[in-house]
């Protein structure tokens, strides 16, 4: 007869299970806000988060932090027996206790109290969960992470590399033998930390040490983690070996029946392949074309597999990148996109069938980033894949994800002042990388779209990416520290943020950000110095800007002598020299600047010698070739000649030199320069033709728009209008000494010209960043509105004045290389 005194744990209500699962799911991601329904669980999860904040991506908490957290942990331990809310939930009780003792062990370890740490680790390890009826899949995942975390610190606390490795090799596969979901970030983190401590060269070594077969996808996954951790290490080509393993898996697989699921071994192998193909994509490594047959067979032997579709997306993009056949290239890219579409469709179906629970939200975000980075509007497929809609869906999904998991998100208004509003968010490494990549992807796609700049979306994207960085140099010994990949990525984000602020004409904030975030820690980051000089050039006194430029030019020359100047820095060197000329012209006059002009051509010849073909181009576009850069120098010279008296022929010769640099490609900047030269020579018909040619190809081209406006406005200027025009001033690159004007047949012809100019300018300020912030555009709009007796002319004139006062000596784009 059963003992009636034995207390049977009640069944946990589904609502409690849901909120506990959501809290654990958020914590596995690295979240910090929890509402599990149990104060004790929330408290210990919060304690764990605060501890990880000082542990993940760093050398551990400082002693004062350790002391505070240890005291809180010990108080929680004392109060465990008094937590009545846990009386009916032994599974939650054991979970709280296990988390707490892991935290205590970590704190004792970082305090150097290794015996105490060992005691806590062993105590945590003895906490077994026997109430299987109360356990959920999320609890199982969380428990697995806690065991692996415990294993990692048991290895460390031994303080012996051989003992540590033996512990890892002996126990890891007993606790985890499949690749975890990417959303299980904490488990991912500790697996990565363990792999970083293992010493091996070949996959075979790794398999032997773990006493398993080399075909094990989890072993292959661990090997790939090591590859990602050692980016500079020589790559060992195992492609054919992996393909053989995959083909062996396929031989044992058949299509599932209605009552069966997809083959686990094949699914697991495809998860490994996602990391492998991502690695080959990043490293631009060509894979065996036979992978195509493997992935097609995988599709044929699975039903709506999320994992196979994502693997196919990566593979087909790799095949596209490495194909020399344009038709095959496009076909493979299309296949990659179609598999992404399937991936999203299968994920949506999973979400609907599993009570609005994602299969793997981080994997989902990662796939979106990948496909958007590797496609464009031209790759849209009618009724299947619309690029712009996909970008919008991605942005919405990313914001929804942050809201669902209560993750800190910087708003548009807050993002205008990073120094005041920034928060450091610490997540597991794989989570941080995926989310940083996601925000960066949105920025790169939308960085040229005016509406996202004006609405502060761009600064918001960059701030949310910057918050995720866990690696940054200390101020001390800056020059002696070698910069890692994460630090380089953060520095680039900080530059883009400063650049975006400068684009918005938040000049003072941009200056503070450059000086505080970048230049104090990266004194040799030349493009940041160039941006700072351009921002300082807004000030009436140009001396500060000039000093910055001269100082940086000296530093770059030293780097050139030491042969440490990178290709993009060579482009920066030329443009910095041109900025110096612009400042000399502003401070000392055009003739003084012209005397310095030959130095630019000498510098170009030194930086880009014909004997070094690797310096010929920064990328596949013509605008990335050294010939295009030389054309820019000649155009700069031509514009400078136009601003002096009686130098029309020199300007004409410079434009001709620019045109002769490269005959295969027509540079529209030559047309623009010819247009302005024609204005000076009083040839309005020729000028109009040149500007119309440019506007045909680029309807928002600022220089062509302003040139076109000059031909129409004003026909006659009164004294007051002349003074106003002198105030707003055309940019230094375009200031003709004479005025050519179009001759209109009649009033209808004149009105049509006004109407067209109005249309072009109004379209430009809605679509073009350069046009929107151009004082010239707002000046001509104010003249048009005044002609039409439109009150908007007052607002346009105010914007003209505002943006003239904030106008740098040269366009900001010249520092962004």
Curated annotation (Swiss-Prot):
The keyword Phosphoprotein does not apply. It comes from the Eukaryota. It is a peripheral membrane protein. CDD domains: YPP1 (cd23270). Disulfide bonds: none annotated. Keywords: Cell membrane, Endocytosis, Membrane. The keyword Cell membrane applies. GO terms for biological process: endocytosis. It is found in: Cytoplasmic granule; Cell membrane. GO terms for cellular component: plasma membrane. SUPFAM superfamilies: TPR-like. InterPro entries: Endocytosis_PI4K-reg_protein, TPR-like_helical_dom_sf. PANTHER family: TETRATRICOPEPTIDE REPEAT DOMAIN 7, ISOFORM A, TETRATRICOPEPTIDE REPEAT PROTEIN, TPR. Belongs to the YPP1 family. Interacts with STT4 and ribosomes. Involved in endocytosis. This is Cargo-transport protein YPP1. It comes from Saccharomyces cerevisiae (strain YJM789).
């Amino acid at each position: 007869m059963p003992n009636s005194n034995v207390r049977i744990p009640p069944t946990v209500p589904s609502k409690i299970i849901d909120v506990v699962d959501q809290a654990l799911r958020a914590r596995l991601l690295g979240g910090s806000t929890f509402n599990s329904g149990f104060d004790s669980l929330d408290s210990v999860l919060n304690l764990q988060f605060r501890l990880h904040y000082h542990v993940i991506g760093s050398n551990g908490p400082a002693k004062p932090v350790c002391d505070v957290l240890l005291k809180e942990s010990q108080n929680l331990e004392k109060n465990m027996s008094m937590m009545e809310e846990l009386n009916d939930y032994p599974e939650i009780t054991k979970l709280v206790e296990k988390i707490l003792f892991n935290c205590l062990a970590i704190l004792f370890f970082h305090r150097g109290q290794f015996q105490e740490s060992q005691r806590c680790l062993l105590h945590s390890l003895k906490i077994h969960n026997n109430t299987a009826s109360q356990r959920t899949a999320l609890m199982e995942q969380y428990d697995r992470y806690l065991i692996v975390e415990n294993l990692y610190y048991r290895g460390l606390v031994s303080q012996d590399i051989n003992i540590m490795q033996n512990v890892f090799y002996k126990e890891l596969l007993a606790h985890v033998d499949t690749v975890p979901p990417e959303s299980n970030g904490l488990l991912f983190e500790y697996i990565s930390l363990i792999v970083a401590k293992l010493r091996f060269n070949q996959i075979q070594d790794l398999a032997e040490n773990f006493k398993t077969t080399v075909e094990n996808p989890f072993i292959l996954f661990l090997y790939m983690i090591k590859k990602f951790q050692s980016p500079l290490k020589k790559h060992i080509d195992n492609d054919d070996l992996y393909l053989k393993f995959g083909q062996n898996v396929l031989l044992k697989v058949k299509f599932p029946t209605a009552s069966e699921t997809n083959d686990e071994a094949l699914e697991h192998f495809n998860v490994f392949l996602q990391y492998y193909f991502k690695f080959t994509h990043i490293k631009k490594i060509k894979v065996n074309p036979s992978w195509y047959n493997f992935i097609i067979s995988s599709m044929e032997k699975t039903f709506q597999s999320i994992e196979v579709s994502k693997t196919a997306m990566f593979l087909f993009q790799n095949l596209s990148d490495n194909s020399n056949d344009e038709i095959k290239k496009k076909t493979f890219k299309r296949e990659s996109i179609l598999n992404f579409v399937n991936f999203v469709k299968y994920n949506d179906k999973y979400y609907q069938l599993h009570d609005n629970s994602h299969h793997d939200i981080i994997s989902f975000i990662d796939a979106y980033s990948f496909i958007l980075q590797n496609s464009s509007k031209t790759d849209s497929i009618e009724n299947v894949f619309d690029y712009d809609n996909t970008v919008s869906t991605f942005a919405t999904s990313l914001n929804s994800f942050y809201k669902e998991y209560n993750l800190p998100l910087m708003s548009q208004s807050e993002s205008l002042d990073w120094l005041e509003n920034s928060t450091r968010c610490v997540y597991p490494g794989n989570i941080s990388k995926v989310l940083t990549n996601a925000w960066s992807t949105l920025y790169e796609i939308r960085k040229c779209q005016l509406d996202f700049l004006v609405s502060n979306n761009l600064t918001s994207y960059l701030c949310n990416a910057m918050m995720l960085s866990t690696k940054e140099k200390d101020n001390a010994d800056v020059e002696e520290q070698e910069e890692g990949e994460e630090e380089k990525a953060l520095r680039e984000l900080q530059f883009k943020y400063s650049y975006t602020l400068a684009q918005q004409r938040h000049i003072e904030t941009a200056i503070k950000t450059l000086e505080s975030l970048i230049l104090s820690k990266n004194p040799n980051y030349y493009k940041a110095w160039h941006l700072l000089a351009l921002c300082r050039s807004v000030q009436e006194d140009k001396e500060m800007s000039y000093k910055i430029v001269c100082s940086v030019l000296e530093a770059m020359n030293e780097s050139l002598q030491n042969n440490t100047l990178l290709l993009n820095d060579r482009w920066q060197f030329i443009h910095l020299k041109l900025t110096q000329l612009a400042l000399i012209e502003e401070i000392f006059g055009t003739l003084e600047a012209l005397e310095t002009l030959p130095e630019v051509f000498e510098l170009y010849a030194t930086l880009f010698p014909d004997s070094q073909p690797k310096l010929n181009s920064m990328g596949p576009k013509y605008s990335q070739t050294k010939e295009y850069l030389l054309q820019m120098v000649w155009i700069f010279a031509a514009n400078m000649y136009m601003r002096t008296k009686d130098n029309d022929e020199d300007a004409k010769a410079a434009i001709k030199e620019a045109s002769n640099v490269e005959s295969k490609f027509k540079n529209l900047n030559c047309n623009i320069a010819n247009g302005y030269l024609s204005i000076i020579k009083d040839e309005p018909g020729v000028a109009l033709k040149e500007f119309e040619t440019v506007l045909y190809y680029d309807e928002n081209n600022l220089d062509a728009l302003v040139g076109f406006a000059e031909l129409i406005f004003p026909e006659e200027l009164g004294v007051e209008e002349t003074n106003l025009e002198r105030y707003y001033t055309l940019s230094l690159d375009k200031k003709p000494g004479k005025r050519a004007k179009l001759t209109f047949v009649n009033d209808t012809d004149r009105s049509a010209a006004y109407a067209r100019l109005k249309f072009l300018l109004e379209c430009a300020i809605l679509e073009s960043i350069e046009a929107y912030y151009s004082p010239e555009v707002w000046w001509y709009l104010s003249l048009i509105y005044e002609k039409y007796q439109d009150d908007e002319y007052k607002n346009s004139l105010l914007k003209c004045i505002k943006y003239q006062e904030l106008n740098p000596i040269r366009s900001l784009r010249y520092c962004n290389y």
